[in-house]
UniProtKB/Swiss-Prot annotation:
DNA-binding region ranges: 16-47
Positions of region (Disordered): 50-92
Biotechnology: Fusaric acid is phytotoxic to plants such as cotton and banana. It has been shown to induce programmed cell death in plants. In addition to a mild toxicity to animals, fusaric acid exhibits acanthamoebicidal, antioomycete, and antimycobacterial activities.
Protein name, entry field: Fusaric acid cluster transcription factor FUB10
SUPFAM superfamilies, per the entry: Zn2/Cys6 DNA-binding domain
Primary subcellular site in the record, as a coarse category: nucleus
Organism in which the protein naturally occurs: Gibberella fujikuroi (strain CBS 195.34 / IMI 58289 / NRRL A-6831)
Comp. bias intervals (Low complexity): 74-86
Transmembrane segment boundaries: none
Single GO cellular component term: nucleus
Amino acid sequence: MAGDFSNRAPWKRSACDRCRAQKLRCHRDSGHSTDACLRCLKSGIECVTSKARPTGRPPSRQVQPTVVVEQGDTSSSSHTTDSSPSAGGTDMSNMMNFEYDLSLDNILDSIGMQHSDFIVNDNILVDISPLSSSQSTSQHSVAQAQAQTVDPSTIQSTASYQFNTLPSTSSMDSALPMRSDHVELLLSRLHSKLSAQLYSIRSSPWDVKGTLNLSLAHQGIGQDFENCESHPLVQVSQACTELERLLSGLRAPASAEHTPSTFSYTPAVPPRLRITQLLIALSCYIQIVSIYGIIFSKVFDYLLSTSKTSVGSYQSSPLTLYIGGLPIPPNETLSGNLLVHLIEHQLHQIEQLMGLPEHYRVSSRAKDTKDGELGLFGSQHSQSLLNAAIQLGEDRDGNHDDIRCVRALKIVMRQIKDF
């Protein structure tokens, strides 16, 4: 019989399980092939030889039946089709009763290996699995910790901008570089505040006499802005400081042309800005000029209605200010002149950053300087946009023409100086 190794020749005998597992030659006594092999005899263990495989070419495998499941039928039915030729006349019931030995021991035995050879590998997998699970656990804990540290209140929708959550723009902040998009958002918030202030100063009464008061304090009255309602002059002054800082973030640094770099080229003129950025900056400037125009008009009307007397008549405790050791008299006209020069200096900084031409400025521009060439409206394209926007304001009917508010402020400030 092909599977009986006792009738085989010595050179066709099967190796024992131990030699087969170690892939070694199984040496036996040539006269006694059924005895234990020399390696097992030397080791003093039992020599076990499993059922031998038949020698020669293995028989061709029978074709397995293909199972087709019909999807349309509600009941689970299967049809078997034989892909082998029908010449043999094989019965389908015999094919279904065919036993397949797919055990692990049989598969390993067919390739000359034993299941015990994988014990070491199983131990390795057991040792690796806790490591991988610990790594996945640590990654999950880190991700969970990061998710817990995120404040849900800071998650905002990209469809709307919350201006209240933007950082403050006070002059005491450090001069950090800001993106132009961020500056545009801050300019939009400033524009909204100036619009509300312009409406309030036109519709609500305010203390005109307090504009000319001289006071001496360790802290400016602007420090009480968050605690109580401030004077319109303080509010617009704070808006000027904020606008000056934002314009500095949009304009290229003036030292760029004096600092050559061997690795990168820095242009002397600022990069071209978007139309929205230029228009919103110009609108903020026009609103500030309009607010100052209303304030100085009220102040000039107040000076005309009162006599040129000392402020001691309406100030409870007159203070004496000194400049160069000389006392400054508490006079209304002098207070008005000081206020005009202060506002001119404040507007000059903004107009210099914007690069406005002479006929669009409130302050006087020095003839020997080129402070407007590097401003926002210093380029030819920006000048064209500025002229178009100003001309549009001149053509429409109303009392809030843009160029007229600049001229009106210059006239009333000159009148206060000459009063």
